[in-house]
């Protein structure tokens, strides 16, 4: 096994033997003379026998499984640690170890690494996607690392001592604003030509994208209304025990979205019948298997006697018929044999002809006599002509039969809800969607391409899904696309599996009446917000109302307020409470007063489910999962996953649980309910919003050049004029398209600027000095439950090398921003895989094992008085 402990420790031993080979040969010879049991003499035969017991002393917490090998009484000779050990390359570490090692270099398989500070190398390595680290993407230009914003303390060092505190704070705020503004402008210039960026912010592309999204939304709405009119939602409940019916409904929606008809929906019934037939067939086989051995011996004997009698009667009848059948069979066999003999003769003639043709090219072939060859060729030509005539007649007969079968084929329902798809993990940001479509269109059955949003932490690489018809051989297409490059980027597609669990459940507490009523309120609010945002039930601004088949108001929200108002019998409770009820201070004798039974209201649940299905089918929003599935119309599954209510909880629930569920659920829905955020006018001006008129004036001024007295040039056309006003007039008249381009560019930048959630590079914070709270026992950091993990993000540019004071996992390290949750940092020697955090340290504290990360087994020997008080400075 490649990942077993023995194999893994063997490779680690081999690694350190290679490191010592440059200066330890004399010591090895001495040890061999002393008769030490050294396994190096048997490189091939001794590999498997080399055990992890040789480093047993470095891991005292391990259990002994076998007797350790013999060693001499004297301690092993220690060697000096070389200065270059920290940066040594490890032949057994692949590029996969780098994100977890946290320190110096294993070999990288991507572009050649530049000379310079080791932290720059680490940062560049972590920024690359995995394909670049493995060599799939050639020659990626990493560019200059982004600048880091100064901390207030660093900023104060650049100021004069005469600047007071308030002025320093003001200047620092201005510095931060300028820094962010500059970063935003640099980001815009770096990505303005990329397709994903233009489709999001360029005025022309934004309009096209909105029209496409609106058309897809209208199509999904028509599908929902069609299914509702057909009664698909009448008896459908979003409970986990109705999973089969829910999947069938989702498939029906997908068939309708793909342009299917009512006839195509019949395939769902056929699939259901086939499944039931398969189940009944299996059940009948099991019953027969059980019933077979259950027959008694008496029954078997009786059956045997009856069979013998019947056989005796049949024997007489059969004897008279045997002669007739034998004759007929004999005649039939003779005819079949004749036909087979004729076919074989024809085949043999053809083979002989082919062989003779092939042999005629050989120098040593002996030709037959001319008369024989001519006669044979004439016969062969006749046979070929007859065969050709027969072949011509066959297609005509087939064509006559085709129209009869065509009517039956047209009626056959199509499985439009099933597709095949390929998944592409890394698509470079400079690759356009049209390029992928043109590449995949060459293969039959191509349907569509879906691209995910770019990921800033992965250099804005995107994931892609290419959908094909179900009838294609998807593995063959995947193989053909395997080694194709687009703009020096390997697509490396893989076959995308079908969804396994399309219906998933959440907590069954959602069946409670109080929660259902609250969900109706939230779902109605969500529908109202999404409909307004997409203007689904209103005509687009600036266009006359076009008569459509869609109603003017959402029929789903009709009379919804009837279910939002809770009816209470307050008067009755007041009268009963004041007259005969027990005082509220007195607790009941039995049961917990805070616990209640789960109360299910079928009427409310039916209303809620219709709202949730509207959200799922029309707006691609999974309510119980509190998430929106973006670009679902372009994905392989147009209606893939849905979350539903789980089974009813077996125990009583507390009132606090109900309130806590409602509170957390509303918090999760808040981002979906919020209107798209955009910067205010004041904030936009601070960030550098551009005025179109001013930018046009700048453009005209820059293209008005004075050559001399009364001599002005327009560089756009090369024409000369007597004055600047003539140049201006010329630009507006003859170069109006350039003016429009400037205005569009301004709108492009302003759209990006005003987006509060605009993409940006991951923020890299400066290294923080270690505080007293960071000095903890080895392996433990506040709020970090996983002491074995090391930073998976990138190291900041210019960060100093980690200090050497801590050999173990307790070394105090500067903070490394990763853009995610903080992780404890790698100890000294982490260039060899951060091994000390896994094995050494004498079992102090708990040491989780991880076989994927290999490292240094030579833990530092620690001397500690067990009776002394705790001291964190020991080695």
From Swiss-Prot:
Protein name: Serrate RNA effector molecule homolog
Compositionally biased tracts (Acidic residues): 369-386
Residue positions where Phosphothreonine is found in the record: 543, 670
One biological process term in Gene Ontology: primary miRNA processing
UniProt xrefs under Pfam families: ARS2 (PF04959), SERRATE_Ars2_N (PF12066)
Residues with Phosphotyrosine modification: 8
Gene Ontology CC annotations of this record: cytoplasm; nucleoplasm; ribonucleoprotein complex
GO function terms (MF aspect): DNA binding; mRNA cap binding complex binding; protein-macromolecule adaptor activity
Compartments (UniProt record): Nucleus, Nucleoplasm; Cytoplasm
Phenotypic consequence of gene deletion: Death around the time of implantation. Deletion in adults leads to proliferative arrest and bone marrow hypoplasia whereas parenchymal organs composed of nonproliferating cells are unaffected.
Residues of the signal peptide: none
Tissue/organ expression: Widely expressed, with a preference for proliferating cells. Highly expressed in hematopoietic tissues and reduced or absent expression in parenchymal organs like liver and kidney. In the brain, expressed in the subventricular zone by niche astrocytes, ependymal cells and neural stem cells. In this cerebral context, expressed in slowly dividing cells.
Omega-N-methylarginine sites (modified residues): 832, 839, 849
Positions of post-translational Phosphoserine modification: 4, 67, 74, 136, 492, 539, 569, 678
Basic and acidic residues biased stretches: 8-73, 297-345, 387-411
Residue span of region Disordered: 1-90, 272-411, 571-597, 834-853
């Amino acid at each position: 096994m490649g990942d077993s402990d023995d194999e893994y420790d063997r490779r680690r031993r081999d690694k350190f033997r290679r490191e010592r080979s440059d200066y330890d040969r004399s010591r090895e010879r001495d040890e061999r003379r002393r008769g030490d049991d050294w396994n190096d003499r048997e490189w091939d035969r001794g590999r498997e026998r080399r055990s992890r017991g040789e480093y047993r002393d470095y891991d005292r917490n391990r259990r002994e499984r076998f007797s350790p090998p013999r060693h001499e009484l004297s301690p092993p000779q220690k060697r000096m640690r070389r200065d270059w050990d920290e940066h040594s390359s490890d032949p057994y570490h692949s590029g996969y170890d780098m994100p977890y090692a946290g320190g110096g270099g294993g070999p990288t398989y991507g572009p050649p690494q530049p000379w310079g500070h080791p932290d720059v190398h680490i940062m560049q390595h972590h920024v690359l996607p995995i394909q670049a680290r493995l060599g799939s993407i050639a020659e990626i230009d990493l560019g200059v690392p982004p600048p880091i914003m100064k901390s207030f303390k660093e900023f104060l060092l650049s100021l004069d001592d005469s600047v007071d505190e308030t002025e320093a704070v003001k200047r620092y705020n201005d510095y931060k604003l300028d820094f962010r503004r500059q970063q935003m402008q640099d980001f815009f210039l770096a990505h303005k030509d990329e397709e994903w960026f233009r489709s999001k912010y360029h005025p022309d592309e934004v309009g096209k994208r909105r029209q496409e999204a609106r058309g897809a939304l209208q199509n999904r709405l028509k599908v929902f209304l069609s299914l509702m009119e057909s009664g698909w939602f009448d008896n459908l409940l979003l409970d986990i025990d109705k999973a089969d019916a829910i999947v069938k409904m989702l498939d029906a929606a997908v068939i309708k979205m793909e342009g299917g008809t009512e006839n195509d929906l019949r395939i769902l019934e056929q699939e259901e019948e086939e499944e039931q037939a398969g189940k009944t067939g299996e059940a009948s086989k099991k019953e027969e298997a059980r019933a077979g051995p259950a027959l008694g011996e008496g029954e078997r004997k009786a059956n045997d006697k009856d069979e013998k009698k019947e056989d005796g009667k049949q024997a007489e009848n059969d004897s008279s018929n045997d002669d007739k059948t034998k004759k007929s069979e004999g005649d039939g066999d003779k005819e079949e044999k004749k036909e087979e003999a004729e076919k074989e003769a024809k085949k043999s003639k053809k083979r002989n002809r082919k062989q003779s043709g092939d042999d005629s090219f050989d120098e040593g072939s002996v030709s037959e006599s001319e008369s024989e060859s001519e006669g044979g060729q004439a016969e062969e030509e006749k046979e070929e002509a007859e065969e050709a005539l027969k072949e011509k007649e066959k297609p005509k007969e087939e064509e006559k039969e085709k129209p009869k079968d065509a009517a039956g084929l047209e009626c056959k329902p199509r499985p439009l809800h099933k597709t095949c798809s390929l998944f592409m993990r890394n698509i470079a940001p400079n690759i356009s969607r049209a390029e992928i479509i043109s590449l995949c269109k060459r293969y039959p059955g191509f349907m569509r391409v879906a691209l995910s949003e770019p990921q800033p932490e992965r250099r804005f690489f995107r994931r892609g899904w290419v959908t094909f018809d179900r009838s294609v051989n998807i593995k063959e297409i995947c193989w053909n696309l395997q080694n194709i490059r687009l703009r020096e980027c390997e697509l490396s597609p893989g076959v995308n599996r079908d969804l396994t669990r399309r219906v998933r459940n959440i907590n069954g507490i959602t069946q409670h009446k109080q929660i259902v009523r609250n969900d109706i309120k939230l779902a109605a609010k969500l529908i109202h917000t999404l409909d307004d945002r997409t203007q689904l039930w209103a005509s687009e601004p600036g266009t006359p109302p076009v008569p459509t088949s869609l109603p003017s108001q959402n029929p789903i929200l009709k009379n919804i307020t009837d279910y939002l108002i809770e009816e209470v019998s307050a008067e009755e409770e007041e009268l009963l409470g004041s007259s005969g009820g027990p005082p509220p201070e007195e607790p009941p004798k039995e049961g917990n007063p805070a616990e209640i039974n789960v109360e299910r209201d079928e009427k409310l649940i039916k209303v809620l489910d219709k709202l949730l299905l509207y959200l799922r089918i029309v707006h691609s929003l999974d309510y119980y999962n509190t998430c929106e599935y973006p670009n679902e119309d372009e994905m392989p599954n147009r209606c893939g996953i849905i979350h539903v209510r789980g089974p009813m909880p077996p125990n009583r629930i507390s009132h606090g649980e109900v309130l806590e569920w409602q509170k957390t659920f509303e918090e999760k829905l808040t981002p979906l309910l919020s209107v798209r955020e955009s910067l205010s006018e004041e904030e936009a001006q601070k960030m550098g919003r551009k005025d179109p008129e001013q930018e046009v004036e700048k453009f005209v001024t820059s293209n008005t050049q004075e050559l001399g007295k009364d001599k002005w040039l327009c560089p756009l056309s090369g024409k000369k004029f007597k004055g600047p006003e003539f140049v201006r007039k010329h630009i507006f008249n003859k170069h109006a398209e350039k003016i429009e381009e400037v205005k569009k560019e301004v709108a492009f930048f302003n759209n990006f600027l005003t987006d509060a959630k605009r993409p940006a590079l991951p923020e890299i914070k400066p290294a923080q000095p270690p505080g007293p709270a960071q000095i903890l026992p080895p392996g433990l950091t506040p709020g970090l439950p996983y002491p074995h993990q090391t930073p998976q993000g990138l190291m900041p540019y210019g960060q100093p090398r980690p200090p050497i004071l801590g050999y173990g996992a307790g070394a105090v390290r500067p903070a490394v921003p990763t853009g995610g949750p903080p992780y404890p940092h790698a100890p000294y020697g982490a260039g060899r895989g951060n091994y000390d955090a896994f094995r050494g340290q004498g079992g102090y504290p708990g040491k989780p094992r991880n076989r994927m990360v290999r490292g240094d087994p030579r833990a530092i020997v620690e001397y500690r008085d067990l009776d002394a008080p705790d001291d964190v400075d020991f080695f």
